Design a protein with these regions (language model features):
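Bacterial Sec-dependent N-terminal signal peptides
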Residues: 1-24
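CBM-like carbohydrate-recognition segments
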Residues: 25-69, 81-88, 97-115, 119-121, ...
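Long, well-ordered core segments of solenoidal/helical folds
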Residues: 30-49, 89-107, 138-158, 190-216, ...
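Inter-helical turn/loop segments and adjacent helix faces that build the functional surface
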Residues: 82, 183-194, 247-259, 312-318
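Acidic/serine-rich, low-complexity amphipathic helices located in mid- to C-terminal regulatory regions
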Residues: 171-186
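Acidic/Ser/Thr-rich, low-complexity mid-to-C-terminal regulatory regions of eukaryotic proteins
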Residues: 214-235
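Oxyanion-binding "anion nests"
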Residues: 239-287
Length: 382
């Protein structure tokens, strides 16, 4: 009965979702990005659209929470493309309202090391590059200096005390590492990059599966199987791949550590090309396509962003990777409803699960806007 139900779902999806082959035009990319960005800003405080399948996704997100931080990363990219200053104004207002501080959940010392709470700093640095106002970045630099002078000595093991003071869950590689490179570039001080590289390697040594070229979400998944397959969560690996792209985008290609990231990026890109679904998305359990036929737009958008970024920067061959990017982007666009809401965003979690046609989440919108920014360039946008 279970297998019959799965087959029925797959057949339904094959008939529901078209095989995407329509040409991508830069003006249409910009149009759909605006529609999604405008919908999100208008409905940012409306909890009715948020998936409600866990206690973690019921309340309003703090404006500096990682969920919103991921949104702001994508919104910053859209703001740089838009024909209006209102998106920069919206982002700037958030920073001003919070004195340009990073998220301080549960008090300063309780979370000073936590990667999630660093995410919003990436947007502060994007805004600094536009407005040249040092108050936008000073709190971030001060906090990172504190971390450098008082580095966490906890182990990477998931059960270690204060274990998330280190980047021991794969999502962290999106949240914090790009910001360390930004700080280094601004201050012209190598110590921030050195710290980032050391911690990234520690995370990779802990979570990266060298056979599959994918990351476990955290150490609690090492010995678990889902329908007989290893559990590689799509959004978790999306965080990694987008974070990897963002680190490389900030890092000088001549930097001594760039080849390390380049090698890792190429391995992941090759794997992602192999496991993309015919419909254009990636299964929520990356190696379990037949068990997770429902589309999911946050992890997939991050993959599209990273792949398109690689083509645009001459790292990936367009003839090889371009069709996958095109198929993926068209699939994501098909899940934007007529009002501009991006659907099928998996709720907050740590493993494969469910996604819904009438629900969204802020980080999914951020991923979509990030993807659109590179798709726009790839198809001739100026």
């Amino acid at each position: 009965m279970k297998h019959a139900k799965q087959i029925s779902i797959i057949i339904l999806l094959l008939f529901t979702y078209p095989i995407f082959s329509q040409d991508i035009k830069p003006e249409e990319v910009k149009k759909i990005m605006k529609k999604v960005a405008d919908w999100e800003i208008k409905h940012h405080d409306d909890l009715a659209y948020r998936a409600q399948n866990s206690r973690l996704s019921r309340g309003k997100h703090d404006m500096l929470d990682w969920t919103n931080g991921a949104l702001y990363v994508g919104m910053s990219k859209w703001a740089a493309m838009a024909d209006s200053e209102k998106y920069f104004d919206w982002l700037k207002g958030i920073g001003e309202d919070h004195d340009w501080k990073l998220h301080m959940r549960n008090g300063y010392y309780a979370r000073v090391f936590h990667a999630d709470d660093h995410t919003v700093g990436q947007t502060y640095f994007h805004l600094y590059r536009k407005y040249k106002d040092e108050k936008m970045i000073k709190p971030t630099i001060n906090q990172f200096d504190f971390i450098l002078y008082h580095p966490s000595k906890t182990k990477m093991d998931w059960k270690s005390p204060f274990h998330q003071d280190r980047w021991n869950w794969c999502d962290a590689l999106f949240m914090s590492p790009p910001l360390w490179v930004m700080v280094s570039n601004l201050t012209r001080d190598r110590k921030y990059i050195d710290f980032m590289v050391k911690e990234w390697k520690a995370t990779t040594n802990h979570l990266y599966d060298k056979k599959e070229n994918l990351y476990y979400r955290d150490g609690s998944y090492f010995n678990k199987l889902d329908n007989g397959t290893k559990i590689f969560w799509a959004r978790g690996n999306g965080w990694v791949f987008a974070g990897l792209s963002n680190v490389m985008d900030e890092l000088d290609p001549n930097d001594k550590d760039y080849p390390y990231f380049l090698k890792l990026y190429k391995k992941m890109a090759k794997k992602l090309l192999e496991i993309q679904t015919p419909q254009g998305h990636w299964a929520m359990s990356l190696l379990g396509q037949k068990f997770y036929p429902t589309p999911e737009t946050s992890g997939s958008s991050f993959f599209i962003y990273g792949l398109a970024w690689g083509i645009n920067n001459g790292i990936l061959d367009k003839a090889t990777y371009g069709p996958a990017v095109e198929r993926g982007w068209n699939a994501m666009v098909s899940h934007v409803n007529s009002d501009g809401m991006l659907s099928y965003v998996q709720p907050i979690g740590a493993e494969p699960g469910e996604a819904y046609p009438d629900k969204t989440e802020v980080y999914g919108v951020g991923a979509f806007l990030s993807a659109g920014s590179e798709i726009y360039k790839l198809y001739g946008g100026k």
